[in-house]
């Protein structure tokens, strides 16, 4: 056994590849061939693929030292295969590759010296060795056959009698063979050469007549080599028969590469069918070779799927020594075809052939054939058919018996006769002697020459052989073919007189016979008189001469191109005329004329076709112009009609608008009658503004509140931004799809741009934004508008641009035009100029050489004093990332100072500040109002400042920054108005700038004077990272004005740093490949989206979410159970495998084919606002095996509404919470889903979504509970249990109450009256999300999607980074200035405890509870003197205030009017006051609320309660009047991060005493479990609405150590840790700010001599504990 030898050969570039400037993607080193993917960036894993073969031939450039010639290929492959044939083996060499890859050149070669291919060289070498080794005892005989396979039809190329398609048969011993294929005997190499030449001529004639090319047909040249050796000792003659198969396959290119259509495409499909089958055979044989040898099952090899593979069966994995030559192209434009060829060759390496020596095959074969013939004769006789035998075995006559054959099976008889005739043909061929074979070969040759002569093909004078030669005198035609191998193979004489040309069907015999389409019976006549040939066309004959259609007779000149019909192309040559022209030119020494050029230049088939297109193009242009004129007229006519229709529609719509306007006015007049004012009060429009009754009567406080609300909502832009993203996503996808198809290497993606100091909008985008309004009368700063833009990443030029949405839509029109023009351009048409069609490429913009690295800002307030300062400021890019640092010195110039830098530049300038310059576009961030500060940080900033002022007593307090300005209220003498002031700005160094930038320079200017900028010289940036020294000194002289002084106080100077990249193109520009600081978790959207409710068949589509005022919010705990029918007839909850890492997640373990019920239990605190009436519907749908779901699955038939059982309110002993439970029967088979009907496969998880529609009292809509459940279905009798050992050993799954899944929901009750107001309807507008709309060519984007809502979150983080950087820069400047002025006189450094407090506060500020809107402005904190002093209120005052509060809220009832008991109620509208982050920070506010704590104590008769302490209890809720609400139930995705977990002693209001519970803190929720092993959440506390208290007064009152309380809106909890060291840890997990405050207070007391130490506090607590125990 031996493997197939595989060689790869790469050819040089052809003319087409050179014209397209193709690049070489093939590399060869030894036997390894590497191919580079031009579509993949270099230096990646997929860019280069390497293959190892037996031989790799580099024939790309003949100048290379490793160039492989034809002889080298033959020495490696041909000589080895020839030696195998002499050894008696079958041999096969086949060439594979796309058209034009060099297969025919490698196999056949050319006529020139050293250009022969493998077939001629192996034949020549064969006869050379025969002559050298032939003796009397060793005789050789050689026979050849030549066939062509085209469209699964086999054609004999050597015998003209075999005009039809030959039949492929199979014999048990011979295998597949071609019946009646000529096998001709040859005696020397010249015979083989002549046969190859004649076969090619026959192939050329047939291909021309049928409009074929050799690239679409397979050619198989077979040599039958027989060796007869006579042994003198035994007097026996042995034979060895070898079959040498040399195959030239058709082109293997894809159909889309050839551009074939119609019939050509069908032919190509048949050709590719053979090649496809060949590939299947190669792959199947490779898989068989790679499998283990002991496989019992026989592998199927699809040999019979095509004639080619069926004939080559023995050569592929059978009895043969096989070699494959893969011919490939080196050009990048043929990458796909070349890679496919290399993969085929790589698979072919694994094929194993089992070659054996073919010895003494004829004797055995003849014997078996005779036996088979005798059996067939007996069979025919049994059928009643007589067979007459003659002496010759080659002839038999079959006589059928009509009487008996009627009663027999006709098909069996015909098959037997067919087999008999085939076997007799084989016997006759085998018994034929060598002399008879030579005689038959000669007869076929004579017949072949007669056929050629009859067709008009020229023969030599002896009339014996056919050859290609150039006649000396006679004019002639030479054929031209698309395939160079078939060109100039046929020669037709033009005899003296008339030479007729037509088909063989003509009445008059034609001298030259052609066939094919568009050839008439009598097509034309050539008249030869005195060596002048005139072409006479017949009527309706299609004839072109030199590209012009011939209508009248024309004299042919030598070198003329003659096209007959559509397919037959010839070159006319008149030797006498050519000789006369040459002699005339030589004698007269004239210049070369056109005739000589035509005769001497290369004239081939391509030249003739191009000439035809060029000459016929004149008529085509005229026809095209006529067609364009018609289209233009049609366009004008249709446009006129469209304008008329549009005018009519406009008038119709205007009339409708007028009618609606009148209707609105009538309704307005009708409604005005109900007003308290008469209509005469506002007859005129301006009365609304001038009538005193419409003047505002607001107080100053009301006006301030209105302004606050206006400013607050003016900064909320998320909805409009999302609408822009959704609405324009389809345009972005279309632009990217067109870019990919046109190979523009341009990408488009959404981006958000905000006009800030660090990221000013480009001028073209700034013009699309409304002008920035200055601050209003209430001091509101200007709005920084955020807009949606398109980021254009030009990877070809390495540039990044920003387009507006309008510009994208305009450019998209040009892109569509370019795409249509590209699609309509013909492959043969000349390249068009893009600029001439569209005025420029719409994909590209001009880009500057220098790119912006970043910006920096330096404040100038040190010039007020005046003192010099040296700043080190960050260089920040537009995304808020620090790209380096800049050192700047700013100092006043009070006298003539000399600055000397070695390489520095010193310049001077003069500026003038006008009065308008005092109002800059941007405001400093420290001038934001406290209201917006509260919006941004959830009220933390003001409390943190208060904490720092009270607790620390030093550091940077709120007046730190203002002290500098207080000293500068009166400017010094150097800043007197009217005088000139000079200051110096020195750009020292830049550090930390990336090595990708070169030639760094700095440019700076005042914020309002962009046109007057100062620039440094460029500095070379080395990769060593050394600081870049600018040392640029700029003296600026300014006449002092009030605006200039104001600018020094508040505004900075802007520094811009530029540079350009080291390498080009700048493909890394858009990637921003540097380490960026990730946003905090609170800035990110939810990682797993909450599923939307399943659409109910009963309620229909869900209405829009209401946006009215939220009256109340409640935390709801929901338990989900899936019960299965047990053997005892009861429904038992199925086992739930709870997740340890993800809270409220679990996996239901179900059994197949068992009745089920879904049980849902709702748990919440008792309240009069939430009362469950009934369950309306429970819908289950979206059955899937992935966690993600889509709303499109609601349209499926798998959505099922379950049968319901009545809901019931439960009462749990010892638990006063509200419980509501309902069940529904679930027949999962009704979903008709295979996922639920069958047993789940290994590792498969099934997901469903259920939605419960519940009815509540006083609610206009149902409340919807939606939950995603995951499950695994086992067999009916399988034992289910947790798959994890932890849950299995715990045994909790045996407890029915543990087999439930928990969901945490937030129930929001909104006012229903506002649901239909016009303002709400406007806010509920829905914009269609076009990101999922299909765009043609979208599949080329490979899953790319436009960015959506996540872009808004990312942009918010970028803006927050910019905000922080600006604040830090300003504060660093103030600190540096204070230090320079010596104002920071505090000698005590900051203690470690105070640093811990700051860290705690910073961590709390980044809690997910609070959302930051960094772009909103802030104003200074209110003056502490304006804060109303706090006071103690007596009981009557407190009752009165609560009563007034209820009256304002509309919650006060008559029953409370006579109720003298005061109730401290925390209503839903008081959530802001009950916020733990607000009420738990200030110690003063805590002490003022002591009366609330004391009133929230339970009765003193509790035996188990601590002495003197009662559990904190909430106030009871007052009775609510009848009111309609709109409920919203939203599932809360609980954070997986555990802040603290452990055991706590819990005492709750209404409980029976202390209980030890397992508590887990997942902010902002606290979950309470029965024990550590309990997997179900039994209670939940919302820390966002809870009040945490831990003070010495409380500890002294309860007399129990290590306690703290958590008070919610509905109940209070007293929590006790198991150890005194755990108190701070639990407090830090629940409320970090309170823990930091207590720790800071304890640390501060250690520094005060009169304070009580921590040990004394512990001793006191211990004493109290002892007394309590006694």
UniProtKB/Swiss-Prot annotation:
Belongs to the TRAFAC class myosin-kinesin ATPase superfamily. Kinesin family. Unc-104 subfamily. It comes from Drosophila melanogaster (Fruit fly). It comes from the Eukaryota. Disruption phenotype: Flies prevent nerve endings from transforming to synaptic boutons: growth cones become constricted but remain within contact fields as thin processes that lack varicosities or boutons. Mutant embryos die at late stage, they are paralyzed and lacked the coordinated muscle peristalsis required for hatching. This is Kinesin-like protein unc-104. The keyword Protein transport applies. Residues 1537-1635 form the PH domain. GO terms for cellular component: axon; axon cytoplasm; axon terminus; cytoplasm; dendrite; kinesin complex; microtubule; microtubule associated complex.
């Amino acid at each position: 056994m031996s493997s197939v030898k595989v060689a790869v050969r790469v050819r040089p570039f052809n003319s087409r590849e050179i014209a397209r400037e193709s690049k070489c993607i093939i590399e060869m080193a030894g036997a390894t061939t590497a191919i580079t993917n031009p579509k993949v960036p270099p230096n990646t894993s997929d860019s280069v693929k390497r293959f190892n073969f037996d031989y790799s031939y580099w024939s790309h450039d003949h100048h290379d030292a490793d160039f492989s010639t034809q002889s080298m290929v033959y020495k490696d492959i041909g000589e080895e295969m020839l030696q195998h044939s002499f050894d008696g083996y079958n041999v096969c060499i086949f060439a594979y590759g796309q058209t034009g890859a060099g297969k025919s050149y490698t196999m056949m070669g050319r006529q020139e010296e050293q250009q022969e291919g493998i077939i001629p060289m192996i034949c020549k070498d064969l006869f050379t060795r025969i002559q050298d080794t032939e003796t009397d005892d060793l005789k050789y005989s050689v026979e050849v056959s030549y066939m062509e396979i085209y469209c699964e039809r086999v054609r004999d190329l050597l015998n003209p009698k075999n005009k039809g398609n030959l039949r492929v048969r199979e014999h048990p011993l011979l295998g597949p063979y071609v019946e009646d294929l000529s096998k001709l005997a040859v005696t020397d190499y010249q015979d083989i050469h002549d046969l190859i030449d004649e076969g090619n001529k026959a192939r050329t004639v047939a291909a021309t007549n049928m409009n074929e090319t050799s690239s679409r047909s397979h050619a198989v040249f077979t040599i039958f080599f027989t060796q007869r050796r006579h042994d003198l000792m035994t007097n026996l003659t042995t034979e060895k028969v070898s079959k040498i198969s040399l195959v030239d396959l058709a082109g293997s290119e894809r159909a889309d590469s050839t551009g074939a259509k119609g019939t050509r495409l069908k032919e190509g499909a048949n050709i590719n069918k053979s090649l496809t089958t060949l590939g299947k055979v190669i792959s199947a044989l490779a898989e068989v070779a790679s499998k283990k040898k002991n496989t019992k099952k026989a592998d199927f090899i699809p040999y019979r799927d095509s004639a080619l593979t069926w004939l080559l069966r023995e050569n592929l994995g059978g009895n043969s020594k096989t070699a494959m030559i893969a011919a490939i192209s080196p050009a990048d434009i043929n990458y796909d075809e070349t890679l496919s060829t290399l993969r085929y060759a790589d698979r072919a390496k694994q094929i194993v052939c089992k070659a054996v020596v073919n010895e003494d095959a004829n004797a055995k074969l003849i014997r078996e054939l005779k036996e088979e013939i005798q059996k067939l004769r007996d069979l025919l006789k049994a059928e009643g058919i007589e067979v007459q035998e003659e002496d010759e075995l080659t002839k038999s006559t079959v006589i059928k018996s009509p009487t008996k054959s009627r009663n027999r099976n006709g098909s069996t008889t015909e098959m037997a006769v067919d087999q008999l005739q085939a076997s007799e043909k084989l016997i006759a061929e085998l018994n034929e002697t060598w002399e008879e074979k030579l005689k038959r070969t000669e007869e076929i040759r004579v017949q072949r020459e007669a056929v050629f002569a009859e067709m008009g093909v020229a023969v030599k004078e002896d009339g014996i052989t056919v050859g290609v030669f150039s006649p000396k005198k006679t004019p002639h035609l030479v054929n031209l073919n698309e395939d160079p191998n078939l060109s100039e193979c046929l020669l037709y004489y033009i005899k003296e007189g008339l030479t007729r040309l037509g088909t063989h069907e003509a009445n008059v015999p034609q001298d030259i016979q052609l066939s094919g389409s568009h050839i008439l019976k009598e097509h034309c006549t050539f008249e030869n008189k005195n060596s002048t040939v005139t072409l006479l066309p017949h009527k309706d004959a299609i004839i072109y001469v030199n590209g012009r259609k011939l209508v009248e007779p024309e004299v042919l000149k030598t070198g003329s191109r003659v096209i007959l019909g559509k397919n037959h192309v010839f070159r006319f040559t008149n030797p006498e005329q050519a000789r006369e022209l040459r002699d005339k030119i030589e004698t007269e020494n004239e210049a070369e004329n056109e005739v000589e050029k035509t005769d001497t230049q290369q004239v081939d088939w391509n030249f003739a076709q191009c000439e035809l297109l060029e000459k016929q193009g004149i008529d085509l242009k005229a026809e095209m112009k006529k067609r364009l004129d018609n289209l233009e007229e049609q366009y004008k006519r249709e446009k006129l009609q469209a304008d008329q229709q549009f005018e009519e529609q406009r008038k119709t719509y205007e009339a409708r608008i007028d009618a609606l306007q009148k209707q609105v006015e009538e309704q307005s007049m009708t409604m005005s009658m109900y007003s308290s004012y008469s209509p005469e009060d506002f007859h005129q429009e301006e009365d609304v503004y001038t009538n005193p009754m419409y003047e505002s009567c607001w107080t100053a406080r009301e006006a301030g509140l209105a302004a606050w609300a206006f400013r607050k909502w003016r900064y909320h832009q998320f909805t409009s931004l999302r609408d822009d993203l959704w609405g324009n996503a389809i345009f972005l996808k279309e632009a990217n799809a067109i870019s990919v198809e046109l190979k523009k290497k341009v990408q488009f993606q959404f981006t958000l741009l905000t006009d800030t100091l660090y990221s000013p909008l480009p001028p073209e985008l700034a013009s699309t934004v409304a002008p920035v309004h200055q601050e209003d009368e209430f001091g509101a700063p200007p709005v920084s508008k955020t807009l949606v833009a398109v980021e254009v990443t030009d990877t070809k030029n390495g540039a990044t641009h920003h387009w507006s949405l309008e510009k994208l839509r305009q450019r998209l029109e040009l892109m569509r035009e370019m795409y249509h023009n590209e699609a309509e351009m013909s492959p043969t048409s000349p390249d068009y100029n893009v600029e001439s069609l569209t005025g420029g490429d719409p994909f590209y913009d001009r880009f500057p050489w220098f790119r912006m690295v970043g910006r920096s800002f330096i404040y100038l307030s040190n010039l007020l004093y005046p003192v010099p300062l040296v700043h080190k400021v960050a260089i920040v890019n537009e995304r808020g990332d620090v790209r380096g640092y800049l050192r700047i010195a700013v100092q006043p110039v009070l006298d003539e100072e000399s600055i000397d830098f070695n390489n520095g530049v010193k310049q001077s300038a003069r500026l003038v500040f006008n009065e308008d310059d005092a109002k800059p576009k941007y405001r400093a961030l420290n001038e934001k109002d406290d209201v917006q500060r509260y919006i941004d940080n959830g009220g933390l900033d003001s409390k943190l400042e208060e904490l720092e002022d009270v607790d620390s007593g030093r550091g940077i307090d709120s007046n730190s920054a203002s002290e500098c300005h207080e000293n500068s209220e009166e400017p010094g003498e150097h800043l007197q108005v009217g005088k000139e002031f000079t200051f110096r700005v020195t750009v020292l160094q830049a550090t930390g700038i990336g090595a990708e930038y070169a030639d760094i320079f700095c440019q700076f200017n005042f914020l309002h004077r962009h046109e007057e900028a100062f620039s440094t010289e460029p500095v070379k940036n080395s990769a060593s990272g050394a600081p870049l020294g600018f040392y640029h000194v700029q003296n600026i002289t300014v006449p002092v004005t009030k605006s200039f002084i104001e600018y020094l106080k508040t505004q900075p100077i802007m520094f811009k740093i530029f540079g350009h990249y080291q390498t080009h193109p700048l493909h890394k520009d858009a990637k921003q490949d540097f380490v960026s600081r990730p946003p905090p978790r609170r800035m990110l959207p939810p990682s797993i989206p909450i599923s939307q409710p399943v659409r109910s068949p009963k309620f229909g589509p869900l209405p829009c979410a209401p946006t009215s005022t939220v009256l109340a919010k409640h935390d709801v705990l929901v338990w989900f159970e899936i019960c299965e029918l047990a053997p005892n007839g009861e429904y038992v909850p199925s086992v739930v495998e709870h997740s340890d890492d993800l809270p409220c997640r679990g996996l239901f373990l179900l059994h197949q084919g068992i009745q089920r019920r879904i049980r849902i239990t709702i748990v919440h605190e008792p309240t009069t606002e939430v009362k469950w009436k009934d369950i309306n519907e429970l819908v289950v749908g979206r059955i899937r095996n992935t966690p993600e779901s889509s709303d499109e699955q609601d349209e499926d038939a798998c959505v099922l509404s379950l049968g319901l059982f009545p809901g019931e309110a439960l009462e749990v002993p010892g638990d006063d919470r509200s419980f509501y439970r309902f069940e529904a029967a679930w027949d999962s088979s009704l979903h008709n889903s295979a996922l639920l009907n069958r047993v789940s496969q290994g590792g498969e998880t099934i997901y469903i979504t259920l939605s419960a529609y519940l009815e509540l009292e006083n609610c206009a809509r149902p409340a919807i509970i939606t939950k995603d459940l995951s499950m695994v279905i086992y067999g009916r009798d399988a034992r289910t249990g947790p798959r994890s050992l932890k849950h299995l050993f715990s045994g909790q799954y045996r407890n029915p109450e543990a087999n439930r899944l928990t969901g945490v929901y937030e129930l929001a009750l909104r006012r229903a009256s506002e649901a239909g107001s016009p303002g709400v309807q406007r806010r509920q507008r829905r914009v269609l999300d076009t990101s999922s709309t299909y765009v043609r060519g979208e599949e080329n984007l490979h899953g790319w999607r436009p960015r959506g809502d996540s872009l808004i979150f990312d942009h918010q983080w970028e803006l927050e980074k910019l905000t922080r950087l600006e604040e830090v820069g300003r504060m660093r400047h103030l600190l540096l200035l204070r230090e320079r002025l010596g104002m920071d006189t505090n000698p005590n450094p900051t203690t470690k405890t105070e640093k811990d407090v700051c860290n705690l506060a910073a961590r709390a500020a980044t809690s997910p509870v609070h959302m930051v809107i960094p772009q909103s402005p802030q104003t200074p904190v209110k003056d502490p003197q304006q804060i109303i002093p706090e006071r103690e209120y007596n009981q009557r005052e407190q009752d009165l205030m609560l009563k007034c509060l209820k009256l304002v809220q509309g919650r006060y009832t008559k029953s409370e009017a006579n109720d003298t008991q005061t109730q401290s109620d925390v209503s839903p509208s008081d959530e802001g006051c009950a916020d733990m982050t607000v009420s738990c920070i200030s110690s003063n506010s805590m002490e003022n609320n002591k009366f609330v704590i004391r009133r929230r104590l339970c009765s003193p008769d509790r035996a188990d309660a601590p002495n003197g302490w009662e559990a904190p209890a909430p106030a009871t809720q007052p009775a609510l009047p009848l009111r309609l609400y709109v409920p919203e139930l939203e599932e809360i995705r609980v954070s997986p991060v555990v802040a603290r977990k452990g055991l706590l002693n819990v005492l709750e209001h209404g409980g029976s005493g202390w209980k030890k519970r397992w508590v887990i803190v997942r902010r902002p929720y606290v979950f309470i479990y029965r024990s550590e092993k309990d997997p179900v959440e039994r209670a939940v506390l919302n820390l966002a609405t809870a009040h945490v208290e831990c003070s010495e007064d409380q500890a002294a009152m309860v007399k129990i150590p290590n306690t703290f309380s958590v008070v919610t809106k509905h109940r209070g909890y007293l929590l006790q840790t198991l150890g005194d060291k755990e108190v701070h840890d639990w407090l830090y997990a629940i409320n970090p700010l309170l823990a930091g405050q207590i720790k800071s207070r304890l640390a501060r007391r250690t520094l005060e001599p009169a304070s009580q130490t921590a040990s004394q506090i512990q001793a006191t607590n211990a004493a109290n504990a002892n007394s309590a125990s006694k």
